[in-house]
Amino acid sequence: MGKLNGTNPNHPKKGSRITVDPIRDEKSIKKIKRKLKSFPRDYLLFVLGINNGLRISDLLRVKVGDVRNLDAGETLTIIEGKTKKTNVLMINKSIHEALHHYLNSKVLEDDHYLFQSRNRDDKGNHKPLARETVSKMVKTWTDGMRGNYSTHSLRKTWGYFQRVKFGVSFEVICKRYSHSSPAITMRYLGIEDKEVNDILLNEI
């Protein structure tokens, strides 16, 4: 069942785009954090992903020595792999705590990738986690949640909360994402101004 003449009727049609969702509520984020707390590497990857808005490919290139001695409020300058533009990885308080929780959990050399896999290269060195591996991890973390989630969900979650919770303008988020226009950022996040206005009806 599910296939007819060698095709899967549930598979997206050729040329169609699959929308990847941000994690839109804080309860789900807290639930994932609780689930990952016993897995320091994965916990750090999640916290770092939702707090910086960087592409996962750039996070996976970070090495232990790049961030070991950074304090909260300090930054690491990176060159984006896709755009070749200079950007920064900010170490906020949540990231700093997750980072040191991870670094204290095992012996890691400065030349090790921060998010290393079990796979090794020809010289016997650990490779970084593959993007496809992280995508599977994200799908596991978000299992049972409505929506479609992958590595981009971490990056999108950062932008979603910056706009909806903190009221940061699309122009500022656009610059962080290195998008060519705020309109692209709005479509990327799937946010309309009405969605922002609706939350103002919430009573505290």
Positions of PLM-derived features:
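Conserved catalytic core of the tyrosine transesterase superfamily
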Residues: 1-204
